[in-house]
A protein has these predicted regions:
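All-alpha prenyltransferase/terpene-synthase fold signal
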Residues: 1-187
C-alpha cells in the first residue's frame, strides 16, 4: 500500500520518465522533439495536471462555481487527454491543422469523459467500475452543479463536438467509435 509520500514520489518518477521518453523519441525533426517536450510540460505543469490538482485540493472545503469546476477539470482530465492526443499527432508527423484538431478533440472528449465519470460515481456499479461508488459526492463536480440529466446531455453534446473535430484526419473511424462509446459507458 502506498502512503501519500510514496504516491507523490511515484508520480514524480512517472513525470520524469515521460520527459525522458519525449526527449529521446525518434521524431523526424528536432523541432518536433522540442514541441513534444513543450506540450508535455504545459499539460503537466502549473497550467496542466499539477495546477489542476492544486486547484482541486485548495477547493475541498468550499463549493466552486461552474467556471472554477471547468478550470479544475480542464487542467486535470483534459490536460492528460490533450497530451496524449497532441503528442500522437506529433509522433505521426501530422500537420498544424491536425494538431489543432487533436487539441480540440481532447478538450471536448476530456470534459465528456470527466462528466461521465462523475455520473458513474452516482449511478455506476462498484464491481464494474473497480472503484468505490459515491466517493466524489462531496467533491466539486459538474454533476453537483447541473444534476444527472443535464450532465448526460453535456456528455452527448461534447462528444458530438469532439467527433466533428476529427474531420482533419483521413481515417478517424476508430477515434469516432471511441468517442461515441463514452456516452453510454458503464465502466
Amino acid at each position: 500500500v502506498y502512503g501519500e509520500g510514496t504516491a507523490v514520489l511515484a508520480g514524480d518518477a512517472l513525470l520524469t520518465d515521460a520527459f525522458m521518453l519525449a526527449a529521446s523519441a525518434e521524431l523526424r525533426r528536432p523541432k518536433d522533439i522540442a514541441l513534444a517536450i513543450g506540450i508535455l510540460a504545459h499539460n503537466a505543469g502549473s497550467l496542466g495536471m499539477v495546477g489542476g490538482q492544486m486547484l482541486d485540493i485548495d477547493s475541498e472545503h468550499r463549493q466552486l462555481t461552474e467556471q472554477e469546476v471547468y478550470d479544475v477539470q480542464s487542467r486535470k482530465t483534459v490536460a492528460l487527454i490533450n497530451a496524449a492526443c497532441v503528442l500522437g499527432v506529433i509522433a505521426g508527423g501530422g500537420s498544424a491543422k491536425q494538431l489543432q484538431a487533436a487539441a480540440e478533440f481532447a478538450t471536448h472528449i476530456g470534459l465528456a469523459f470527466q462528466i461521465r465519470d462523475d455520473i458513474l460515481d452516482v449511478i455506476g456499479d462498484q464491481s464494474q467500475l473497480g472503484k468505490a461508488i459515491g466517493a466524489d459526492e462531496a467533491k466539486n463536480t459538474f454533476l453537483r452543479i447541473y444534476g444527472i440529466e443535464k450532465c448526460k446531455e453535456l456528455v452527448a453534446t461534447l462528444t458530438e463536438k469532439a467527433i466533428r473535430s476529427l474531420d482533419a484526419f483521413e481515417d478517424h473511424s476508430y477515434m469516432r467509435e471511441l468517442a461515441q462509446s463514452l456516452v453510454s459507458r458503464m465502466m
